[in-house]
């Protein structure tokens, strides 16, 4: 689950991280009112969407008068903001963050993720903060410094100080940077985040260290422990199909291709998409029906995939372990009939009650294309999507 920048800053404040004064605004008049409350002479008008690259996309403006606050708010609010993370369609801006300006002397970067190889939380920092951190990571990875934190003790003062020095924080500002790094780590740990990022972390002209941005992603499996985080959820920022899928315990992610995938198990789902790509196709979605796929779930899965106007074919790839193949076959047949399936359907099933499941599909009277291996299934669905 993702949240907005202003919500991330609310979390950072709770953990002692210095952030600029600011408030969200949902209308132009409210934006001007917030600016008046903050006082000038400089304000920043920031689009609030669940995507990075807002500055390059025209979603962040520096205003030097209340008239400019109104002008920029009017420009940004309601716009379809396009960034490298939104896709070509962009994302509509429904809210703004109005905050006080800062005298920026130097932009830095700090971020925290989980390294599954070392099984530790890794704190990253770079002296090359700002809008092009992705380019820094790609072209000069040595500019990003890392420390793997021992979970039982957390981020230590010496580790935080060492990171701060490596990214060029002056000695006089090291204590401030230490508090920010430790506060960011604590916020990451205590909220069950999967990503916590400040970009940029800035050094100001008067020697202060301030988090000028905040980005959090949270582990959806841990949200039951954090109702205060769930309250931050903005459904306007989420894919309607993914929201609908969550109601039926379906793990669904929309993609840009034209071949729908219905699979049980995340690993098999990813392998299925890779195999489709291998044979020249493009997956339209990731869809894991899990180990308890009922007829209702399969039907809803078909409905979700068919909402994609670019869908050309569907591949059902099932390994019958806990889930029996005959149950899946029953769901596929019922689901196909319920939605009047009008695209080619390729089904590959292996495992428990495999023969029975195949027999049910063969006798269903539906134009289902069967396959014995994942490679054969992928080749057949790619050909079907191409109209061959």
UniProtKB/Swiss-Prot annotation:
The keyword Nucleotide-binding applies. The gene is sucC. GO terms for cellular component: cytosol; succinate-CoA ligase complex. PANTHER family: SUCCINATE--COA LIGASE [GDP-FORMING] SUBUNIT BETA, MITOCHONDRIAL, SUCCINYL-COA SYNTHETASE BETA CHAIN. It catalyses: succinate + ATP + CoA = succinyl-CoA + ADP + phosphate; GTP + succinate + CoA = succinyl-CoA + GDP + phosphate. Belongs to the succinate/malate CoA ligase beta subunit family. SUPFAM superfamilies: Glutathione synthetase ATP-binding domain-like, Succinyl-CoA synthetase domains. Its EC number is 6.2.1.5. Pfam families: ATP-grasp_2, Ligase_CoA. Keywords: ATP-binding, Ligase, Magnesium, Metal-binding, Nucleotide-binding, Tricarboxylic acid cycle. Mg(2+) binds at residues 199, 213. Heterotetramer of two alpha and two beta subunits. One of its GO terms (biological process) is succinyl-CoA metabolic process. NCBIfam families: PRK00696.1, sucCoAbeta. Its cofactor is Mg(2+). GO terms for molecular function: ATP binding; magnesium ion binding; succinate-CoA ligase (ADP-forming) activity; succinate-CoA ligase (GDP-forming) activity. ATP binds at residues 46, 53-55, 99, 102, 107. This is Succinate--CoA ligase [ADP-forming] subunit beta. It is an enzyme of class 6 (ligase). The keyword Metal-binding applies. InterPro entries: ATP-grasp, ATP-grasp_succ-CoA_synth-type, ATP_grasp_subdomain_1, Succ-CoA_synthase_bsu_CS, SUCC_ACL_C, Succ_CoA_ligase-like_bsu, Succinyl-CoA_synth-like.
